């Protein structure tokens, strides 16, 4: 990117601001006091929230939106420039045919991918960036929640909505930032956090990657830019191809720095004894289900300890973490049928989600899966893996 993000007062305009990743950035910038506008052809509860904190929202995407800060009398009075040209932010979903995007190019607006804004924010904080094919949202939310409960007051940017901060982002006052770092379009390579986390690595996003090696290369670049790497060595690819500074695993025989024993998977949560380099720290109780969430929590334990928290503080925080929206989210119960909503769309995610559902099911109760495939390219690439991923369902 030729241009550098200007944090000296120049306004921001987001094309497609209603998306989960874009809206989080718009929210943080607005809360920091920057002038922010955004457009989206599908207004939703997220855009309504942005409007409530002062973001100027447009329900149509058209070139005139880029002139808002010139038309706005307050902006004109507070700017020393005659032409208040915004910095334009796009996601991968916005292509060259978009009318606002074309107008931004024509008018010479600085144009940034959303990952450029996130990377710029990451560089301003003691940042913890959570990467991985699966578990990014839950792990980053867990870490943010744990730090919040411990009084650290972090800034948080995640790819899901969390009840504790009523959305997908919160602005804290401490020097810490917890961010979800996305690999789907290769933009992971832009981030240089103090601490990087890898939850796992698999081939996904076949519209962007052809082979696992291509995915690994992206993660290799990312890890080379992390001052400290924390990674789960239960993943074979991570174990064989990366050298984390701090490792974690669900197996006591893995040689990991952090591991668990005495695991108790229950219908109402999970408990395990946590170990740190051969020393028992104590029992961790979670109200979220499944081995995948225990692994996510172990990443949070490793981060908490790295930041100097006592295990008791960590355990108390994680014990009340209820998860993010659409991550094994309880939606209600009718006639004895419990409805769970989950974003899982990769075979590995489906298997983990249904295994957690099986743990929660009462004796004699069936587990019925209703699945909506996400993207033709993913369904076509993993067609042989999808069938066995439903083995925990009836």
Question: Where does each model-flagged region fall?
Answer:
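Generic start-of-chain signal for non-secretory N-termini
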Residues: 1-13
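Active-site beta-alpha connecting loops in nucleotide-dependent enzymes
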Residues: 10-25, 35-42, 324-326, 348-350, ...
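Acidic, Mg2+-coordinating active-site environments of NTP-dependent enzymes
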Residues: 47-51, 58, 65-69, 78-90, ...
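Walker A (P-loop) phosphate-binding motif
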Residues: 12-14, 28, 115-161
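Switch II (G3) loop of P-loop NTPases
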Residues: 176-184, 339-345
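Short beta-strand "acidic-cap" motif of Rossmann-like dinucleotide-binding folds
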Residues: 35-40, 155-157, 178, 247
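Conserved motor-coupling elements within RecA-like helicase/translocase cores
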Residues: 170-175
């Amino acid at each position: 990117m030729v241009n550098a993000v200007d944090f000296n007062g120049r306004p921001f305009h987001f094309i497609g601001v209603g998306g989960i990743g874009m809206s989080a950035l718009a929210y943080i910038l607005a809360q920091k006091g920057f002038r922010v506008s955004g457009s989206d052809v599908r207004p939703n509860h997220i855009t309504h929230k942005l409007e409530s904190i002062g973001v100027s929202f447009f329900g149509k995407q058209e070139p005139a939106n880029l002139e808002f800060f010139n038309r706005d009398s307050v902006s004109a009075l507070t700017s020393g420039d005659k032409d208040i040209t915004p910095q334009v932010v796009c996601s991968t979903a916005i292509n060259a045919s978009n009318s606002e995007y074309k107008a931004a190019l024509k008018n010479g607006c600085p144009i940034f991918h959303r990952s450029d804004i996130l990377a710029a924010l990451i560089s301003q904080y003691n940042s913890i960036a959570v990467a991985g094919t699966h578990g990014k949202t839950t792990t980053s939310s867990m870490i943010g929640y744990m730090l919040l409960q411990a009084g650290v007051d972090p800034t948080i940017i995640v790819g899901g909505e969390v009840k504790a901060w009523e959305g997908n982002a919160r602005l804290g006052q401490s020097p810490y930032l917890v961010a979800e770092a996305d690999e789907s379009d290769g933009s992971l390579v832009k981030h240089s956090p103090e601490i990087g986390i890898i939850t796992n690595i698999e081939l996904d996003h076949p519209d962007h990657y052809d082979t696992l090696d291509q995915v690994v290369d992206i993660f290799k670049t990312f890890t080379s830019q992390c001052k400290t790497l924390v990674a789960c060595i239960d993943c074979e690819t991570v174990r064989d191809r990366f050298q984390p500074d701090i490792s974690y695993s669900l197996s006591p025989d893995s040689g990991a720095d952090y591991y668990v024993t005495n695991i108790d998977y229950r219908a109402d949560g999970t408990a395990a004894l946590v170990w740190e380099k051969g020393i028992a720290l104590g029992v961790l109780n979670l109200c979220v289900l499944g081995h995948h969430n225990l692994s996510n929590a172990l990443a949070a334990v490793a981060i908490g300890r790295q930041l100097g928290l006592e295990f008791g503080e960590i355990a108390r925080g994680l014990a009340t973490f209820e998860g993010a929206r659409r991550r094994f989210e309880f939606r209600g119960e009718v006639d004895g049928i419990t409805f769970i909503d989950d974003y899982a769309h990769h075979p590995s995610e489906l298997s983990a989600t249904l295994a957690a559902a099986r743990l929660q099911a009462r004796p004699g109760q069936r587990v019925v899966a209703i699945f909506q495939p996400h993207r033709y390219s993913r369904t076509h690439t993993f067609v042989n893996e999808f069938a066995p991923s439903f083995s925990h369902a009836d």
